[in-house]
UniProtKB/Swiss-Prot annotation:
GO terms for molecular function: ribonuclease P activity. This is RNA-free ribonuclease P. The keyword tRNA processing applies. Keywords: Endonuclease, Hydrolase, Nuclease, tRNA processing. It comes from Haloarcula marismortui (strain ATCC 43049 / DSM 3752 / JCM 8966 / VKM B-1809). GO terms for biological process: tRNA 5'-leader removal. PANTHER family: RNA-FREE RIBONUCLEASE P (PTHR41173:SF1), UPF0278 PROTEIN TK1425 (PTHR41173). It catalyses: Endonucleolytic cleavage of RNA, removing 5'-extranucleotides from tRNA precursor.
Length: 224
């Protein structure tokens, strides 16, 4: 058996478990989650690699898995092998420059959102009497409003921190000096600003397999 490497810590985002990128072939969500949690448990036992989630992320993920009728086995393994820890909100310090940057970015996004709204209003005014083909119950104005919601949401939220859960993830990672594992580009952008290590969710299972293969190459390189 090889010597254990320096202890590694990771803080996991909801997107890690839900992304299709961690699935093999025609593997479904439940099978992919079980495979991932098995890797996490083996990495903990063999190399003392610890995985964490803030309570807000754990609750969000549990709700999403339950909504998808995922078995209790997955939820039990999640509770067993992923440590739920509240971030130290009053102890972790955030540079003022990052706060100013966030304020400036959100102000710019609000301005862009207003332009999206103005464009939609003009379009609705031009076509309010028309109906949408194949949808007799939906007027062109309804269609414009529907498109507006999607475009406005993308303009304001894509690539930015947009929830307390995202912020909890970063604060906990900073507190623990841990790597962030996520598929969310907004979290990745801010992990860079915080000076945190991060990893795309799709690359996390291969990373754990490499750690495990260093100890048992015959088993883990065959399974990868």
């Amino acid at each position: 058996m090889v010597d254990r490497p320096l202890k590694q810590r990771f803080v996991l985002d909801t997107s890690l478990f839900l992304t299709p990128e961690i699935r093999s072939g025609d593997e479904d969500l439940e099978a992919a989650c079980l495979d991932l949690l098995d890797l996490i448990s083996e990495a903990k036992l063999v190399h003392n690699i610890s995985c964490y989630m803030p309570p807000s992320i754990q609750a969000e993920l549990t709700t999403m898995l339950e909504d998808r009728a995922i078995s209790d086995e997955v939820l039990t393994k999640l509770d067993t092998w992923v440590i739920t820890k509240s971030p130290a909100h009053h102890e972790v310090r955030i540079p003022a420059d990052l706060v100013y940057e966030f304020i400036d970015e959100m102000s710019e996004r609000v301005d862009r959102g207003l332009r999206v709204s103005e464009k939609a209003v003009r379009k609705a005014e031009e076509s309010r009497a028309e109906t949408v083909e194949e949808h007799d119950h939906m007027t062109e104005v309804d269609k414009v409003i529907s498109d507006l919601r999607d475009e406005y949401r993308d303009t304001l939220r894509q690539g930015v921190l947009d929830s307390r859960e995202d912020f909890d993830l970063l604060i906990l990672a900073q507190e623990l000096d841990a790597g962030v594992v996520t598929e969310d580009q907004g979290i990745i952008n801010w992990a860079e600003d915080f000076g945190l290590r991060y990893l795309k969710g799709r690359n996390f299972p291969p990373l754990l397999r490499e750690y495990l293969a260093a100890d048992d190459p015959d088993r883990w390189r065959d399974e990868s």
